[in-house]
Each structure stands twice: as structure tokens, then as C-alpha cells.
Regions:
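N-terminal catalytic cores of secreted or lumenal carbohydrate-active enzymes
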Residues: 1-127, 147-153, 157
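Solvent-exposed loop/turn segments at secondary-structure junctions
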Residues: 26-29, 77-81, 134-139, 177-181
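Active-site neighborhood of glycoside hydrolase catalytic domains
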Residues: 107-129, 136-209
Length: 209
């Protein structure tokens, strides 16, 4: 493992990659679906076994190899108690897959991000940037949350002040998705005063920005 990490991240002995992306809670490769606060109420927030036993030790190893490492983090889903089936009925939605963030929990979910950034800082890791949602237009992932452009903008309107109020320097990247999902050639129209970048994933499509 160390040899692979050194070949990947060492600026002198390897490729010198200095940017990694991690999940806030579970992702496609997790052994089970979970968030960092599965019980209602942020008093239950805590890093889980996957973070403590696997993610953090590897991040520490990478940081020892390349101290210039930047970490971006994104959730695959919000806690299920924050989900609704749709924005018309606001019916609670208990599935890990699909659903929407309940507008009533935007402020709470923003604090969820703050708690994560602070928890990682307490473990010795600076979160350089967050994105509000992994693949926000993908309804079918094992753990997912549908977040339209309008929903993401409304959430960022809560997230940006929450990060600033907590005296954190973490950036916000938006549209954490494939290049070919919108085919928009520029960032014009995005709220650039609080958003640092489009964070398009290189899974599909041609780069337009």
C-alpha cells in the first residue's frame, strides 16, 4: 500500500498528486450505507468506523508523503431523517437512494457539514473544499440525494454563512458531476461570491470549462 501511495502522491518519487476527494459518510465502495448522524439530531453526529479505521489512517499516510495534499469532501446522501420524497408533499423518505433534502433542514444540514469539517480538523486534517452533493442529478446511486441546481443554490445560501460563521476557510465547489450533464461552457450565472469552482467529475463527456 505504501509503495502505491508513494508512487501516486510523492512529488519527488512519484506522480505528485496533491488533491484527493473523500466522502462525508458512505460512498459507492462502503460496506454498508451510513451517514455521520443516522439518528435525528446533530447531538448524535460522529465520525464512524470507516473513517476512523480506514480513511483517516490512509490520509495520514498520504499527508506524510505529500504535506501539500488538499482534501475535498462530498456526501453521497444526507441523513435519511432529513429527506423527503418530493418538494410538493414533503413526505418523509426513508430510502438511502434518491429523495430530496427537506428545505426545513437546510440550516441543520449546513451545520452537519461544519461538524464534519471541525471533526476532521480535530483529527489533524484540513478540509480544503466541500461540495454540497456527489452527482446531484443521479437518483439511482446506492446512496444518493437528488439536488437540482435550484436546490443546491438554496442550500449553499445556508452552507456558506455557516462555514464563515464557524471561522473556517473551507471552500465550496458545486456541480460535482460529469462534464456532459449540462454542456454549459462557462460559470456565468453561478453565485461566484460564495462558490469557488465547478467541480465536474471526469467520468464522462468532454471538458467545457
Amino acid at each position: 500500500r505504501h509503495q502505491f501511495l508513494e508512487h501516486t502522491f510523492s512529488p519527488t518519487q512519484g506522480y505528485g498528486a496533491s488533491y484527493v476527494r473523500i466522502s462525508i459518510g458512505c460512498n459507492d465502495f462502503s460496506s454498508k450505507e451510513y451517514t455521520l448522524c443516522d439518528k435525528p439530531g446533530l447531538k448524535h453526529f460522529a465520525l464512524q468506523n470507516d473513517e476512523i479505521s480506514y480513511v483517516l489512517p490512509i490520509l495520514r499516510e498520504v499527508l506524510d508523503i505529500n504535506p501539500q495534499l488538499k482534501i475535498i469532501a462530498a456526501p453521497w446522501t444526507c441523513p435519511r431523517w432529513m429527506k423527503v420524497k418530493d418538494l410538493q408533499t414533503l413526505q418523509p423518505y426513508e430510502s438511502w437512494t434518491d429523495g430530496h433534502l427537506n428545505p426545513a433542514f437546510r440550516k441543520t444540514y449546513a451545520q452537519y457539514f461544519v461538524r464534519f469539517i471541525e471533526a476532521m480538523h480535530d483529527k489533524g486534517f484540513n478540509i480544503y473544499a466541500v461540495s454540497p452533493q456527489n452527482e446531484p442529478l443521479n437518483r439511482g446511486n446506492c446512496a444518493s440525494l437528488y439536488m437540482s441546481w435550484e436546490e443546491e443554490a438554496s442550500f449553499v445560501a445556508e452552507l456558506a454563512p455557516a462555514i464563515k460563521h464557524a471561522n473556517l476557510q473551507t471552500r465550496i465547489y458545486v456541480y460535482d458531476h460529469n462534464y456532459n450533464y449540462d454542456n454549459i461552457a462557462s460559470q456565468n450565472g453561478y453565485p461566484v461570491q460564495v462558490i469557488d469552482s465547478l467541480n465536474k467529475l471526469k467520468f464522462a463527456g468532454s471538458e467545457l470549462v
